[in-house]
Amino acid sequence: MSNKMTGLVKWFNADKGFGFISPVDGSKDVFVHFSAIQNDNYRTLFEGQKVTFSIESGAKGPAAANVIITD
């Protein structure tokens, strides 16, 4: 499952370093950890941001990987 997907950040807690992305195709929300964010600066996301990502199998189920902010 390495296909690129597009989604909108549903919520992200910068203090805890995780949140969820809602894929635009209507599939189930995907967990995202700050370490998956591809950014040289502070790795955080904001509600409503458009992102592209792939999905990997995490320890507790599907998780976003290679998250790139596109807006």
Curated annotation (Swiss-Prot):
Q: Which organism is it from?
A: Escherichia coli (strain K12)
* Entry GO terms, CC: cytosol
What SMART domains would the database entry show? CSP
- Please spell out the taxonomic lineage of the organism that makes this protein: Bacteria, Pseudomonadati, Pseudomonadota, Gammaproteobacteria, Enterobacterales
Q: Where in the cell is it found?
A: Cytoplasm
Q: Which InterPro entries match?
A: Cold_shock_CspA, Cold_shock_domain, CSD, CSD_CS, CSP_DNA-bd, NA-bd_OB-fold
Query: GO biological process annotations for this chain's record?
Result: regulation of gene expression; response to cold
Which key words tag this protein in UniProt? Activator, Cytoplasm, DNA-binding, Stress response, Transcription, Transcription regulation
Triggers of expression: In response to low temperature (at protein level).
The name on file for this protein is Cold shock-like protein CspB
Q: Which Gene3D superfamilies match?
A: Nucleic acid-binding proteins
Task: Check the record and name the PROSITE patterns matching this protein.
Answer: CSD_1, CSD_2
- Single GO term (MF): sequence-specific single stranded DNA binding
Q: Which residues does the UniProt record annotate as the domain CSD? A: 7-67
